[in-house]
Amino acid sequence: MENAVMEYETNEPKHIKVRGAKVHNLKNIDVDVPLHKIVGIAGVSGSGKSSLALGVLYAEGSRRYLESLSTYTRRRMTGAAKAQVDEVLYVPAALALHQRPGIPGIRSTFGTGTELLNSLRLMYSRLASHRCPNGHYVPPTLKVAAEQEILCPECGAKVHAPSAEELAFNSQGACPKCGGTGSVRTVDLDSLVPDDSLSIDEGAVAPWNSLMWSLMTDVCREMGVRTDVPFRELTDREKEIVYHGPAEKKHIFYKAKKTNQAGELDFTYFNAVYTVENALAKVKDEKGMKRVEKFLKEDICPECGGSRLSEAARAPRLRGIGLAQACQMPLKELVDWVAGVPDSLPEEMHPMAESICESFQTVAKRLMDLGLSYLSLDRAAASLSTGERQRMQLARAVRNRTTGVLYVLDEPSIGLHPSNIVGLNAVMHDLIADGNSIILVDHDTQILSEADWLIEMGPEAGAGGGYVITQGTIPQVIAKKESMIGPFLAQTADMRIRKSVAWEEIFAPGKLHLSTDAIHTVKPLEIDIPKGRLTVVTGVSGSGKTTMVLESLIPGLEAKLNGEHLPGHVKSITAEGIAHVKLIDASPIGINVRSTVATYANVHDELRKIYAKTADAKNKKYKAGDFSYNTGKLRCPVCDGTGQISLDVQFLPDVDVPCPECGGSRYAREAWEICYENKQGMRYSLPQMMEMDVTTALQATQEWKVVHQRLEVLKNLGLGYLTLGEETPSLSGGEAQRLKLASELGRGQSDSVFVFDEPTIGLHPLDVQTLLQVFQALIDNGATVLVIEHDLDVIRNADYIIDMGPGGGEDGGRVVAVGTLEQIKADADSITGKYL
């Protein structure tokens, strides 16, 4: 019998067998992916890594899992189409952690997202000392959990112990004033009269111009306010009437602007504040909100002080503090506080307290491992950086202690400082120890070198990729000369490709200066940024890079350029000669299938004009507008120019398939007949052009100057492998970021500041070199480039480095070191310096 058991164990499959994968650019590949191991997938951007990991392994794993559920359940899930692959054997149920977790809503906090708040609410419901209706506190008792009656020992009144649900700010425990969001929108008095040198007749009161009839100035005059003197010369009483005057009916004479006819009316006075409040109450859509928004400001809710909780939910006490205070502690302190909870209670409550606290501690430990110990539970999830949100997702996945699941991690190193990666590795090994498998798509050599097996895709991007070039253990891959990642894993590749600038010359072209007060966990800062140079902002996760650049510098510069008030925490900002500030981040471009590479890069309009001038088009009287696949006559009549149709299958999810009429080209048959003949005698139709990749199209468009230039820019950005008709929503983060840059390159930029938020996301070390050349091109045009980055290769190429830290959260938020690469390396305080 023992032999039989042994035999059974050895027959277990060791690999996921993929045969004939053709998703996106995969070239019909066969590959065996080891199970119960960390399998890295590397390769240049666009070489087919995500196609293999997400398009084949995850798509099939999640689809098969869904197909094993009942039809009824499946109807409620979004359907997964079958991947284009001959067969995939032994794939486990799969979970994917995407590059960019969605931005959470206003009601989501670090506590709700990690579900730590659930355990904490349970503690406060079952273990806390509750308050009787007359304000006396009752000592903690087991009667709460047993749902027995509790009487106050002081006055004998019946005590109601709130359930965990009644302590939730998204449910019954919400503060009635702000509805559990912690902030209220109030009218910003400063914005109502932006220019007090104007008189009311000249339009000094802004909301009356845009949100109200212009008659209000006449009514205001009847209220006893002088409307023909500059606003600043009005008495306090007159200003009070403008801002807060009563809603009285007045009889006014008015003259119609157009006809010059006089008339009389009874009209009720709306003061400036009420005008805004009234408009806010009637807002129905985004556009209406935009008009009102500029007169509002977000304030912390005066009733709950931003804690989001009602008075009753803030009442229970545990170890002397309420739930609101517990949520304000950084995780590190909260963990120590929770550890002391059981001992603060009567003996008979210990077993229950220990089990509740233990469930809290296991989740918290994971988050601490991933370097999130500095976040407090009440931190709004929307204000976290991408990396922080992704690690929240990861911790949630690990907590469930599942087994036999395939985790597909898409670039988990995003937003991780080299010193945080150690914690990530520990989490991956725990997942494997529980009997799971991991697929890891990444470029960070520090993470890839943890993999037990590496599959390298390539050799090029786009059409030239989609093959497996090498696979094996890390030493095996390094030994193979065809491997492109090998030299970077072995650290033999040379990464310094920009000439460094001498320290004396760095600030020669001028500088920007930023001065701020404290906000979040960032202390007050004074920062200089050299103009016309490549400045990199570094530091561990949570050290305040995002806050300094995205919440202080950019809004400050924008406000200064538009002549608006600086954000509250920004004291001053000097930026001589700067006229534009552009943030280039990696958020996806458009969620619409109608947006393509050609439309985004402004090539499509030019192509339509060219085709409208051909003899074929003139004979059939087609104009440029007819060549649009969105609205023109020549779009495909079946799919309306989207290139795909949705099939409605009874009881099953809708399936999107390429349009049978146009084959995905988006154009009707007539469009294929209109061709342009170039000097080499080659004939192309517009649908054919849209199917070319940028590199091929460059050859075909040599005589069209504008199109050629624009495509050349895409090629120089390393996007030569994208087809012109490719949908922009399907691009990876790194591709989206570089496509946004396309319109900026190639013109003088001495008055512009470009800010990049982790541009190396999705970039192979070889692509990083392309990116550095792009930065150099911007700087050669006179631009100032500021980059938030963890990638050591980019940091090594910086002219000037600002290192934040030293830790994350409360331990961070200061500038630890500034200077050139050599100065940072030599600085003992800089954590980043140690890794350089």
Feature-to-residue mapping (PLM):
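Conserved phosphate-binding elements of NTP-dependent enzyme cores
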Residues: 1-836
